[in-house]
């Protein structure tokens, strides 16, 4: 990310133009784009990035937060893309049949049988519906993916 882009984004947050993003400016910005962030999370963001301890973020401190946000967005997009590969019918869920089909097409030993796939899904199926939704998929991928589930 170049300095010009960072500066433009920073100015969108820095409403009073004092060169710092205060807690209320951060909160107001998120609110203006329809994202409700709890007060404690706003405080955590500022505390984490506020290197000089003045209770606000200057452009350099903001740069770290912005980079983190961009990386999280990219990770989310990658996860959605991977989820779409497994969710073959596009209904928002990965079934045992879809899992078996994708794992077989990848030439993986894991999940050769429907029963294996059901077991793998049951390890991440938080809501107990027998399928993996996107939220469950993200948790699973952060834990090593479907391959990690087949080991026990």
From Swiss-Prot:
Residues 1-36, 37-72, 74-109, 112-147 form the EF-hand domain. CDD domains: EFh. One of its GO terms (biological process) is double fertilization forming a zygote and endosperm. The keyword Secreted does not apply. InterPro entries: EF-hand-dom_pair, EF_Hand_1_Ca_BS, EF_hand_dom, EF_hand_pair_protein_CML-like. One of its GO terms (molecular function) is calcium ion binding. Ca(2+) 2 binds at residues 50, 52, 54, 61. PROSITE patterns: EF_HAND_1 (PS00018), EF_HAND_2 (PS50222). Ca(2+) 1 binds at residues 14, 16, 18, 20, 25. The keyword Calcium applies. Disulfide bonds: none annotated. Ca(2+) 3 binds at residues 87, 89, 91, 98. One of its GO terms (cellular component) is cytoplasm. Keywords: Calcium, Metal-binding, Repeat. Belongs to the calmodulin family. Potential calcium sensor that is required for pollen tube attraction for ovule fertilization. This is Calmodulin-like protein 2. It comes from Arabidopsis thaliana (Mouse-ear cress).
């Amino acid at each position: 990310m170049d300095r010009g882009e960072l500066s433009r984004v920073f100015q969108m947050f820095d409403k009073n133009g004092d060169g710092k993003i205060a807690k209320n400016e951060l909160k107001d910005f998120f609110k203006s784009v329809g994202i409700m962030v709890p007060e404690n999370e706003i405080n955590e963001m500022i505390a984490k990035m506020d290197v000089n301890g003045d209770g606000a973020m200057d452009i350099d401190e903001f740069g770290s937060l912005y980079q983190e946000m961009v990386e999280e967005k990219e990770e989310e997009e990658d996860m959605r893309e991977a989820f779409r590969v497994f969710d073959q019918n596009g209904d928002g869920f990965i079934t045992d049949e879809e899992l078996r089909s994708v794992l077989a097409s990848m030439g993986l030993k894991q999940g050769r049988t429907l029963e294996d796939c059901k077991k793998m899904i049951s390890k991440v199926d938080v809501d107990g519906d027998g399928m993996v939704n996107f939220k469950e998929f993200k948790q699973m991928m952060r834990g090593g993916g479907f391959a990690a589930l087949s080991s026990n």
